[in-house]
UniProtKB/Swiss-Prot annotation:
InterPro entries: eIF3_g (IPR017334), eIF3g_N (IPR024675), eIF3G_RRM (IPR034240), Nucleotide-bd_a/b_plait_sf (IPR012677), RBD_domain_sf (IPR035979), RRM_dom (IPR000504). It comes from Aspergillus terreus (strain NIH 2624 / FGSC A1156). GO terms for molecular function: RNA binding; translation initiation factor activity. Keywords: Cytoplasm, Initiation factor, Protein biosynthesis, RNA-binding. Belongs to the eIF-3 subunit G family. RNA-binding component of the eukaryotic translation initiation factor 3 (eIF-3) complex, which is involved in protein synthesis of a specialized repertoire of mRNAs and, together with other initiation factors, stimulates binding of mRNA and methionyl-tRNAi to the 40S ribosome. The eIF-3 complex specifically targets and initiates translation of a subset of mRNAs involved in cell proliferation. This subunit can bind 18S rRNA. Its main location: cytoplasm. Component of the eukaryotic translation initiation factor 3 (eIF-3) complex. Residues 1-34 are annotated as: Disordered. It is found in: Cytoplasm. One of its GO terms (cellular component) is eukaryotic 43S preinitiation complex. This is Eukaryotic translation initiation factor 3 subunit G.
Length: 286
């Protein structure tokens, strides 16, 4: 009987496959320093899924003031004694830095700030639906930050440049009189204050305005379409801030005006994403 009592039960040696059991997680260290983690889980359909992840550990070193680093290494005392380093969220509230400037008449300043805050709040409610619109390319950015402000004129100023050339300037110096006119103010001469070769530099820039562009268009696709005719220096595709989709127009800048003219001739009327492109030279800034 003693031998039978010492023997293990035969049922303990039998292995049963539990369908609900998952294999243990496996972690393998690779030669390049990364780790491969293999785990298992059940998906929404109840099937067992194997998940393999490759993890790379990156160490970020931060250089701080030695005195600040020394204070961080101090041992906590009082009610915080024995707690881990760093702020404890149950006793410490971390907020943004507030600059305190003491003043003698702080009550009057507080009342004035409260009054101004109410006016600003109402103005903010009035302008919350307003959007910034560029006067040059109609994009959602300020006109001063437009990438084409030096090469194009505003969209609404159609024909302004030609009208300015035909109409004589009002009050021109020496018009109809026999008085002496300086060379830089004579007809056909460069305007005062114009930098050397500024007019010719603008003539060398060749920028095309492409309209009727699909909202699914990408800058890389437009670059590939127009680079067949010459070197493209810049591609600007106007996008909506909220949806990040194209707004229907783009600007293509070429290094050579001849290439731009050939691209304008070939791509005007070209079918792209079920739409017919309209290509023309962008108006230069006056």
């Amino acid at each position: 009987m003693s031998k039978l009592g010492n023997r293990a039960d035969w049922a303990d040696d039998e292995e049963f496959d539990d369908p609900s059991a998952l294999p243990a997680q496996q972690v393998t260290t690779n030669k390049d320093g990364t780790k491969t983690v293999v785990s298992y889980r059940f998906n929404d359909d109840g099937k067992k899924v194997k998940v393999t992840r490759r993890i790379k550990t990156t160490v970020v070193r931060e250089h701080v003031n030695p005195q600040v680093a020394e204070r961080r290494s101090w041992a906590k005392f009082g009610l915080e004694k024995g707690h881990a380093a760093g702020p404890s969220f149950d006793t410490t509230s971390v907020g943004e830095n507030i600059v305190f400037r003491p003043s003698v008449n702080w009550k009057a300043q507080a009342a004035e700030a409260e009054k101004d805050g109410g006016e600003k709040g109402s103005m903010k409610d009035q302008l919350k639906d307003k959007k910034v619109k560029c006067r040059i390319c109609s994009g959602e950015h300020f006109t001063a930050r437009c990438p084409f402000k030096d090469t194009m004129a505003p969209v609404d100023e159609a024909g302004a440049e030609g009208a300015g050339e035909d109409a004589p300037a009002a009050g021109a110096v020496g018009t109809g009189t026999g008085s002496y006119v300086p060379p830089h103010l004579r007809k056909g001469a460069a305007g005062g204050g114009e930098r050397m070769a500024g007019k010719y530099e603008k003539d060398d820039l060749a920028t095309l305005r492409v309209t009727n562009v699909s909202e699914l268009a990408e800058e890389g696709e437009l670059r590939d379409l127009f680079e067949r005719f010459g070197r493209v220096t810049r591609v600007f595709l106007a996008r909506d801030r909220e949806t990040q989709r194209a707004k229907g127009f783009a600007f293509i800048s070429f290094a050579d005006r001849t290439d731009a003219a050939r691209a304008c001739d070939k791509m005007d009327g070209f079918g792209y994403r079920h739409l017919i492109l309209r290509v023309e030279f962008a108006k230069r800034a006056s």
